[in-house]
Amino acid sequence: MNDIYYAIASYHRPKCKTYHALKECGIEDERIVISLNDSNDFKTYVEALGSQAQIITRRGNNVASNRNNILNYFENGAKIILLDDDIRDFRKWEEKQGNKCGAQKKITELDKTFNEVFSFMQKNNIHFMGCLPTTNNMNIASYVKKGETYSFNTLVQGGLCFVIKSAEIKFDEKWDMLEDYELNLRMIRQGYIIARVNNIVPNKSLMGKEKGGMYDRYQRGEQQLWLRRLVKKYPDMVTKKDRTVLLKRKWRI
């Protein structure tokens, strides 16, 4: 099972930027799956993307149910890239010679780049990985300069995740937001290794700035509610700070 599958969770965004970003990189429709949270959107998506696009539906309440729909679509052991629907392109940090600053470079060979991550996962018995939640050059450079390509047992957002399908990876559908962080913390507590790749990032819309997706929830300020619930469920692991949560300590691997 060597193929990588690209799976997009989408809601009310028929233009689906991520689909077009994948096609620009030469990814075949046979390896792209778009899962709709609202089955009523099916016709609109087909009209926007064409009949060749693989579109699956399941009426669900939130992105957690949509991502589970994707996971249930594949067999155990499948290599899956879980994606948001608002990604313009994918980037990798490249260091420069001498004193020149490094820079983000657009990835064109996605399979080659992402296979390196999956190889790392297989060697280290890791089934779930993510990337940095920011495209800020200073943040990325700080990890690369330390030689820290990968971080372990930390929080990763769900916009670009690497999954080797297994039973323990299941989003809690009671969580309307922060379902990615909840899964991270639950797996760490259960003794699984979560990892983050620090030199690959998705170039995507700012959270809560583009209609569709999670836009309405962000506009209603629901994120603060779910941050508090996350801290309440995992008080020994995270603490709330402004609009996010921080790990209280480094968890062993």
Where are these regions (language model features)?
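Short acidic, S/G/P-rich loop/turn micro-motifs used as interaction or catalytic elements
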Residues: 11-15, 40, 87-90, 136-138
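Conserved catalytic core of nucleotide-sugar-dependent glycosyltransferases
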Residues: 90-182
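A structural signal for short, well-ordered beta-strand segments and their strand-loop junctions
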Residues: 79-84, 127-132, 194-197, 239-241
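Active-site-proximal specificity loops/subdomain of glycosyltransferases
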Residues: 35-83, 88-102
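Short, well-formed alpha-helical segments that are part of the catalytic scaffolds
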Residues: 5-27, 40-47
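A short acidic (Asp/Glu
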Residues: 17-20, 43-46, 91-94, 139-149, ...
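Short loop->beta transition adjacent to catalytic acidic/histidine clusters or analogous donor-positioning motifs
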Residues: 2-5, 24-34, 51-54, 78
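C-terminal catalytic/acceptor-binding lobe
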Residues: 4-5, 10-14, 175-253
